[in-house]
Amino acid sequence: LQFQIDDNTFWGIMHGDNSGYYEAFQILAGLYVYFGEKDRGAYWAHQADELKARANEVCWNGTFYTHFVKRTPITISGVDESKQLSLSNPMDVNRGLTDLKKAVSIIEEYRRRRETTAAFAEWFSIDPPFPDGIFGDKKLVQGAYVNGGIMPLVGGELARAAFENGFERYGVDILRRYWNLIGENQATYLWYFPNGAPASVETSTSPEAQSTDGWGSSAMLYALV
């Protein structure tokens, strides 16, 4: 795994980082206006609009946001990167990066993949995943954590996006499936393997794999309320 910037760093643009900045700029603009600094508020609102336009121009592939727009030319064999649907797409909707047409396109893509995937849910961290071992960590096999694991975090964001963009039945369906999932074991995990097996200390690349995940469950709760 690459935790530092050096001569071997692959540079590129990730859509989720940009939607996060967009949301932050909007919040900052609102705070400035609230405290009477309208000029600064207008400045950050303009920065948000400009970033949104650039992100959509660069990252949108016509159906969803490309996982990683490369600045460093490199080819990764064993996966069609143009088809990779990554976890921040529903977040992009909820952060306001999309218009209604793009939001609908993203939601419909998840619904399509639900019909074709062998996984128990369409809440992919990324789909299709990278080949086993590509990150230099033997635990990051296909279907594990951020390499194709099934994440309630994604499901919660997707449910919220569904409720806000005309797919209420789909949003309810996601919440019901999550309710059944946690009801079976009275536990919720950060991620699951596609076959439904939960994360464990032995299979996780994160420091802890607890049965009391708050990241995914809070996203589901946000969609519910």
Where are these regions (language model features)?
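Short, solvent-exposed loop/turn segments at the edges of secondary structure
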Residues: L1, G16, L85-S88, M151-G156, ...
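Aromatic- and acidic-residue-enriched carbohydrate-binding clefts of CAZyme catalytic domains
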Residues: L1-G12
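Catalytic cores of carbohydrate-active enzymes
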Residues: F10-M14, G20-F135, L175-Q210, G214
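Short, well-ordered coil↔helix boundary/capping segments
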Residues: G12-H15, Y145, G149-P152, G214-W215
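C-terminal substrate/ligand-recognition segments
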Residues: V141-E168, Y222-A223
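Terminal, non-catalytic domain-edge segments
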Residues: S217-V225
